[in-house]
From Swiss-Prot:
It is a multi-pass membrane protein. It is found in: Cell membrane. Pfam families: CASP_dom. PANTHER family: CASP-LIKE PROTEIN 1U1 (PTHR36488:SF8). It comes from Arabidopsis lyrata subsp. lyrata (Lyre-leaved rock-cress). Residues 1-12 have a biased composition (Low complexity). Residues 1-24 are annotated as: Disordered. This is CASP-like protein 1E2. Residues 50-83, 133-163 are extracellular. Keywords: Cell membrane, Membrane, Transmembrane, Transmembrane helix.
Length: 190
């Protein structure tokens, strides 16, 4: 009789553990989909940002200014290319990790969980470094640098700056989502 009560209690505890595990997997899947959407949006927003404008350049004070058609694109700055690449890599990794975790629903080994944890950690570092690089160059374009006589670029290419700017908080949010995923991954490890 006493054993029946213990078995019944263990059965309820196991059911509760399964529910918690399912809800944790649901949270993880939701966060991974969010990371996928954020990284894809950030890479796309920055990748398609472009503005062409006619800029007047005065070479010699005695001559009239020269009108030159100039284009601003993210691909012209290595920091922006790095940020786009970081987001594209994180997006691809997220899609692969979602597929792997969906395929191995009930059979997640410790090695798989450790690999996902390490992958998520790499994505955190990659996305934060991409945000930092693009933010530094973006700030330089917005404010210029009087010490080295670099002019403000956003004064001339305002549309480009306004189109590219949203990719920075999107990348930052994706990095934060990956940080939460790292915490979830660490909790899952026994």
């Amino acid at each position: 009789m006493e054993n029946e009560g213990k078995n019944n209690m263990n059965g309820m505890e196991m059911e509760k553990g399964k529910r918690e595990s399912r809800s944790r997997k649901g949270v993880e899947l939701t966060m991974r989909v969010l990371a996928l959407v954020l990284t894809m949006a950030a890479a796309t927003v920055l990748g398609v940002a472009k503005q062409t404008k006619v800029v007047s350049i005065k070479l010699i004070p005695a001559l009239p200014p020269l009108d030159i058609t100039t284009t601003a694109k993210a691909s012209y700055l290595s920091a922006f290319v790095y940020n786009i690449s970081a987001n594209a890599i994180a997006c691809g990794y997220t899609a692969i990790s979602i597929a792997i975790l969906m395929i191995s629903r009930g059979r997640r080994s410790k090695k798989l969980l450790m690999a996902v944890l390490l992958g998520d950690l790499v994505m955190v570092a990659l996305l934060f470094s991409g945000t930092g690089a693009a933010s530094a160059i973006g700030l330089m374009g917005l404010q210029g640098n009087k010490h080295v006589m670099w002019n403000k670029v956003c004064g001339v290419f305002g549309k480009f700056c306004h189109r590219a700017a949203p990719s920075l908080p999107l990348t930052f949010l994706a990095a934060v989502v990956f940080m939460f995923l790292v915490v979830l991954d660490a909790i899952k490890l026994p």
